[in-house]
A protein has these predicted regions:
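N-terminal beta1-alpha1-beta2 module of alpha/beta enzyme domains
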Residues: 1-72, 180-185
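An alpha-helical appendage that flanks or caps ligand/catalytic pockets
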Residues: 1, 30, 131-181, 211-328, ...
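Active-site mouth loops of central-metabolism enzymes
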Residues: 8-22, 79-89, 129, 181-194, ...
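Catalytic domains of carbohydrate-active enzymes, especially glycoside hydrolases
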Residues: 22-43, 199-210, 325-331
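Hydrophobic or amphipathic alpha-helical targeting/insertion segments
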Residues: 87-119
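Conserved, mostly hydrophobic/aromatic
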Residues: 31, 35, 66, 98, ...
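Hydrophobic faces of well-ordered beta-strands that scaffold small-molecule active sites
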Residues: 1, 39-41, 75-77, 106-110, ...
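Glycine-rich, proline-tolerant flexible connector loops at the mouths of alpha/beta enzymes
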Residues: 38-60, 211-224, 336-349
């Protein structure tokens, strides 16, 4: 599941959604009960007025805290690793601790930061955002050192100033104990750029991908196979295997007509700017992200832009068909979100999950 800790309001259509820890924990506990394997939330650093709603919880802390109130689900904390700067010892110690708290159910989503305003919030001068590919080089060096701290049996010394990658931290006789319980925690990143794919192929176990064709399920099914093959091949060249996950919003009711009416009601409640329906009220900050370009390509069939990277709309049978189609083209898993999260998640569990089990997509 893909949680909403940022209080993003896609539409004025009524919803129970809340940014609060209690609401999101209830969603994760329901997902845990249904047998979902993974819970995750994005993280953003925006100035006043940058969010649709009133608040944004820290995803690193919130997902880690959920470990004490869940049983089986894996919890993925998001962290911008280049803001601060972050020292490898901090991340290694925090990660090992959360690994023990969760009994091996914790992992980290590595984010390098694509918005200029976020880099400036942490002290970069205007125009001082770290160059796109350089960010991945710096993050890779950080993860190399963190992995060493998790694995080494002796003290570690390292000087990043000598590598020329742009990091400025040093370690002299560094040591982290206890080590993670079951080896290295799961590492995740979201990307669509060549540099991001190269990073994922070296470090990640899971990569969150986006549809090159935009949000409509037909365009996604048409354009994703080549994208998936590129990512898998990059990992295979390094004798690694990585899983690809995509983020659909599931809009479902008992009948196709009811589901379409629900999706239309969400769309009609979207705010407008200059007569054009927009996604929530978020401002358009300067970003060099490359993963969402498909939404701007008019040659592809576009969706309603009501949440998620792609949209799965329909009756339970239709939703199961679309998830099965994603599986057939090579998607390893889906990180689902919902407009009215908890009620819609319960609908998924009671009406759609049994169909996926019948098709061998769930156990």
């Amino acid at each position: 599941v893909f949680l909403n800790l940022q209080d993003i309001h896609v539409s004025s259509h009524p919803t129970s959604n809340s940014w609060t820890f209690a609401y999101n924990l209830a969603c994760v506990q329901e997902a845990d009960r249904q047998g979902f394997e993974l819970a995750f939330s994005r993280m953003q650093w925006l100035p006043k007025g940058g969010y649709d709603g009133s608040a944004s919880l820290d995803a690193f802390i919130a997902l880690g805290a959920m470990a004490a109130a869940t049983n089986n689900i894996h919890l993925i904390s998001t962290l911008h690793v280049l803001y601060g700067p972050l020292h490898p010892l901090h991340l290694a110690k925090w990660g090992a601790t959360l690994d023990h708290v969760s009994q091996g159910r914790w992992g980290i989503n590595i984010v390098t930061g694509h918005r200029a305003v976020e880099h400036e919030m942490f002290g970069a001068p205007p125009g001082g955002r770290i160059e796109h590919d350089q960010r991945y080089a710096r993050a890779g060096e950080l993860i190399d050192v963190v992995n060493s701290l998790w694995a080494e049996d002796e003290n570690l010394s390292y000087d990043s100033n000598k590598t020329g990658k742009g990091n400025t931290w040093q370690l002299n006789g560094a040591w982290v104990t206890p080590k993670p319980l079951y080896g290295r925690p799961v590492i995740v990143n979201a990307t669509g750029s060549p540099a991001g794919i190269e990073f994922a192929s070296s470090y990640s176990d899971i990569v969150f991908i986006t549809s090159p064709g935009g949000a409509h399920i037909d365009s996604a099914l048409e354009t994703l196979p080549e994208h998936i093959a590129t990512i898998k091949a990059a990992a295979q060249r390094k004798n690694r295997n990585i899983k690809t996950l995509i983020n659909p919003i599931v809009v479902s009711r008992d009948t196709p007509a009811e589901a379409e009416a629900y999706a239309q009601a969400i769309w009609e409640g979207k705010p407008e700017q200059e007569g054009i329906k927009t996604f929530g009220g978020n401002k358009h900050y300067d970003s060099d992200a490359q993963a969402w370009k498909g939404r701007l390509d008019e040659k592809h069939k576009q969706g309603l832009n009501i949440g998620g990277n792609i949209e799965i709309i329909g009756s339970p049978e239709q939703v199961a068909d679309q998830i099965e189609a994603l599986h057939r083209i090579g998607i390893d898993g889906v990180q689902l979100c919902f407009y009215d999260f908890l009620p819609d998640l319960e609908h998924f569990g009671s009406k759609i999950l049994p169909l996926l089990k019948e098709r061998g997509l769930r156990v």
